[in-house]
């Protein structure tokens, strides 16, 4: 099969490409955003017509954290709607047999009953901070369902839980929870051990606002303290700089650490994506309704943020303290997907959170130079 993976440079898209190759697929088509602007309808349609594809996987999207979603809502809804519409409609016009649309668990109402079943879609109000993005993702599901109903296509949708893994975004200001925790604790460990070479390499590869390659150690400490990575002072108020001992460092994280979250390694997500695409159409239709066809992808288990932090602390090898700033809001107390349909369709995750976090940290250290900054 000739498969086009849209968004192959992102965390999810790159994982899908790796998994496809691992499973023996060799005819994989990719285009960078500079080669193909997915918001340009005519260019997308021409590309799909010319390639003669058997399958399209939509892992491309404009994504970002709470601040970005809240600050640029027009960009989030417009770009995501255009990407989805151009690829779905263009695939139909080009006679593409199969398509897989990757959404997000933010499609569900903010006060959904737990665990969240697929049928809870459109049953309540969305989280206001990312509503435009969520509406675009819901539209992607409905595009696939509508084309299936009207044109008899085989376009499928999956909704992953919180993802993490290689090629994630580790920017301190706009990354998701796991990469943010990993990088903060990594930098804290470097301060703890007075490894200024590693700290400056990290800043060079992943810029931090207010810092440059020639910033002094004290300037670095001052800026990192604003990010919650603090070297504590001695009794005489001088910063500890003796390499013969571990410096006393603490990491401050927002909230109580009590919220429960579900985390899925992106390689498991990629495996689930291919599994869903490979399922016979009749078998899939026995589990999903034509107008409620999306499938949750997750682990079926959740964990407190505090427990995740302790695992990361151990994986990184940080000996300092973790402090939770309880004055900051926690957000949703619990967010867990019901994966009953996924399990009945024969798929379960295999990567444990501990193993996944260990692998992700190793990747971060090894590939620091290529970590993307959004």
Language-model-detected regions and their locations in the chain:
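Conserved Rossmann-fold NAD(P)-dependent oxidoreductase catalytic core, especially the SDR/UDP-sugar
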Residues: 85-130, 156, 169
């Amino acid at each position: 099969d000739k498969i086009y993976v849209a968004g192959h440079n992102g965390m999810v898209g790159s994982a899908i490409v790796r998994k496809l190759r691992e499973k023996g697929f060799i005819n994989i088509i990719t285009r960078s955003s500079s080669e193909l602007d997915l918001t340009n309808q005519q260019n997308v349609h021409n590309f799909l017509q010319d390639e003669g594809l058997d399958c399209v996987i939509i892992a491309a999207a404009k994504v970002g954290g709470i601040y970005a979603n809240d600050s640029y809502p027009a960009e989030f809804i417009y770009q995501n709607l255009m990407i989805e519409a151009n690829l779905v409609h263009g695939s139909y016009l080009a006679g593409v047999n199969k398509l897989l649309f990757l959404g997000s668990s933010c499609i569900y109402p903010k006060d959904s009953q737990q665990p969240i079943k697929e049928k809870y879609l459109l049953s309540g109000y969305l989280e206001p901070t990312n509503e435009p993005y969520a509406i675009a993702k819901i539209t992607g599901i409905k595009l696939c369902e509508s084309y299936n109903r009207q044109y008899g296509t085989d376009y499928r949708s999956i909704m992953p839980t919180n993802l993490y893994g290689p090629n994630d975004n580790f920017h301190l200001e706009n990354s998701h929870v796991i990469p943010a925790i990993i990088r903060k604790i990594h930098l804290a460990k470097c301060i703890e051990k007075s490894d200024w070479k590693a700290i400056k390499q990290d800043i060079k590869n992943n810029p931090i606002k207010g810092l440059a390659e020639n910033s002094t150690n004290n300037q670095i400490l001052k800026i990192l303290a604003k990010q919650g990575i603090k070297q504590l002072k001695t009794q005489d108020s001088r910063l500890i700089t003796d390499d013969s001992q571990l410096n006393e460092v603490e990491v401050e994280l927002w909230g109580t650490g009590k919220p429960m979250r579900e985390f899925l390694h992106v390689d498991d997500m990629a495996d689930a994506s291919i599994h869903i695409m490979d399922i016979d159409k009749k078998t899939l239709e026995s589990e999903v309704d034509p107008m409620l066809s999306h499938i949750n992808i997750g682990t079926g288990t959740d964990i407190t943020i505090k427990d995740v932090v302790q695992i990361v602390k151990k994986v990184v090898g940080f000996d300092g303290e973790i402090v939770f700033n309880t004055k900051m809001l926690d957000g949703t107390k619990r967010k867990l997907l019901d994966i009953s349909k996924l399990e009945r369709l024969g798929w379960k995750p295999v990567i444990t959170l501990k193993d996944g976090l260990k692998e992700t940290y190793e990747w971060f250290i090894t590939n620091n130079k290529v970590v993307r900054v959004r």
